Amino acid sequence: MSTIKHNDWLFEQLKDAEFAAEYLNAASEDDDPKTYLTALRKVVEARGGMATVAQKTDLSRETLYSTLSSRGNPTIRTLSAVLKATGLKFGVSAH
């Protein structure tokens, strides 16, 4: 029986848009923005990589890394562009 590391499994799952969306929705339920930014960074890495997403969003790779770090403070415009570059979009729902 072969084993797979959790991060490798997660990376493969995040390539699926529906899974990635649910993953980000779950991360957004935490009141800590760091949780969401960490999750979004994993989605970016799985769904194109930092260099590709940076190019699609007209951000430098360094800026994208900084924006998605635990100390990042991205604007709505930047978040929307990053999500779009990964094939996702913002959504809002009632509690």
Short names for language-model regions:
Residues 41-43, 66-70:
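Conserved interaction-surface patches within small, structured recognition/assembly domains
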Residues 1-42:
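N-terminal flexible/basic segments that precede or flank functional cores
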Residues 46-66:
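Short alpha-helical DNA-recognition segment
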Residues 20, 36-40, 49, 60, ...:
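Amphipathic alpha-helical interface surfaces
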Residues 7, 73-76:
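Structural motif corresponding to alpha-helix initiation and N-cap regions
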